A protein has these predicted regions:
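Glycine/small-residue-rich loop that forms an oxyanion/phosphate-binding "nest" at active or ligand-binding sites
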Residues: 1-53
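Nucleotide and nucleotide-moiety/phosphate-recognizing core
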Residues: 11-13, 17-19, 23, 106, ...
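Conserved phosphate/ATP/ADP-binding segment of small-molecule kinases
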Residues: 41-115
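Short pre-catalytic strand/loop immediately N-terminal to key active-site residues, enriched for Gly-Thr
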Residues: 115-129
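Phosphate-handling active-site elements
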Residues: 115-116, 142-156
């Protein structure tokens, strides 16, 4: 989630250490849809040096991966370099989400030794509000159920893909996913 200051990040770091949290999923909400930064520069540095080393998984989208690594991401090779750089910051693994790129929605998982792509079709819908939060939460749920990280990521990708595919047009603008698609057939 959005941790806008280094003081807030430090509170989270201390709580994670105090309670011995081992399966921390960090969804670094850092960049608004407008492209504006949501974190002060000191918070970005604190996130990199204090919180990411505690993370089992970090789930940045392309703009967030660019902000974390300080590099522009255009190609598949850039995505791989960014993933490697984020793991080098201390995270055990990373999923660089590809929803901001053209073509199929391809996310890149990297655990420090192996890369794996998770690809899903891109749907013609505006009902994508909350996809990143939902993905990170689904990964965390998978880890809490005892799944291996890569398996939790795969199940989260499938869940979010179906939640987008089965979303309803509600109101104006970007609508929500259908988190309850399994209940409503």
């Amino acid at each position: 989630g959005m941790l806008s200051s280094s003081a807030i990040i430090e509170c989270v770091v201390e709580a994670m250490k105090k309670h011995g949290i081992q399966q921390l999923v960090v969804d670094p909400v850092m960049v608004a849809k407008s492209g504006d930064s949501l974190l002060r520069e000191d918070a970005v540095d604190c996130l990199r040096t204090r919180l990411l080393p505690l993370a089992a998984v970090v789930t940045p989208n392309i703009p967030e991966a660019e902000a974390l690594t300080g590099t522009k991401i255009v190609s598949d090779a850039d995505v791989r370099r960014a993933a490697k750089s984020i793991v080098a910051m201390g995270a055990r693994s990373v999923v660089v989400k590809g929803g901001h790129r053209e073509g199929p929605a391809t996310d890149l998982f990297y655990d420090g030794s192996d890369y794996r792509e998770f690809t899903a079709p891109r749907f013609d819908t505006v009902n994508t509000h909350g996809t990143g939060c939902t993905f990170a939460s689904a990964v965390a749920a998978g880890l809490a159920k005892g799944l291996a990280t890569e398996e939790a990521v795969g199940q989260a990708k499938e869940f979010v893909t179906e939640a987008i595919r089965r979303s309803f047009p509600i109101g104006q603008g970007h609508g929500p996913l259908n988190h309850f698609y399994k209940l409503w057939k």
